[in-house]
Amino acid sequence: FGIKGILSPAYLKPVKYMEKAINQQDINLLKKAVPDEYAEWMTDDLEDDMFDLDSDYKIKIKVTDKEKIAKKDLEETLIDDYYVLDSIAEDAKAGYILEAEATLKQDGEKDTQDITLVVVKVDGKWVIVSGL
């Protein structure tokens, strides 16, 4: 991370975990990016399917925009718009909708897609609850 890592907002931490997990094909790192309830769903089957890319690839996720979800709307927005589990939405203390570009480099080719990630603070930890 260096200086940039020190200055990065805490809500970006799970995005970096996700990026690193995909690049290193590490399901345990990915579990750090999501709520415990989601991590429980990540079985060996998911690990096998998820890392079905050749070893010669790299993904880069660049957040291009953010929108803070108003505290008063947080639970309702998470449940109604992003289908987050009620238990997680109820415990969320803050949240952001992040617009990002995910760029996959593989075999000299580059493919960029726009993605939307939703991050929330639950039990003092920022996690991704939508957009995986």
Annotated model-derived regions:
Residues 47-109:
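Surface-exposed, charged secondary-structure patches
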Residues 11, 19, 23-26, 38, ...:
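Hydrophobic face of amphipathic alpha-helices
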Residues 1, 108-132:
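Short beta-strand edge/turn micro-motifs at domain boundaries
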Residues 18, 30, 59-63, 98-104, ...:
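Hydrophobic beta-strand residues in large extracellular and virion-surface proteins
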Residues 1-24, 32:
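Short, low-complexity N-terminal intrinsically disordered segments enriched in polar/charged residues
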Residues 19-23, 27, 56, 107, ...:
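Generic signature of mature, soluble extracytoplasmic domains
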Residues 26-48, 52:
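Short, well-ordered alpha-helical segments enriched in acidic and aromatic residues
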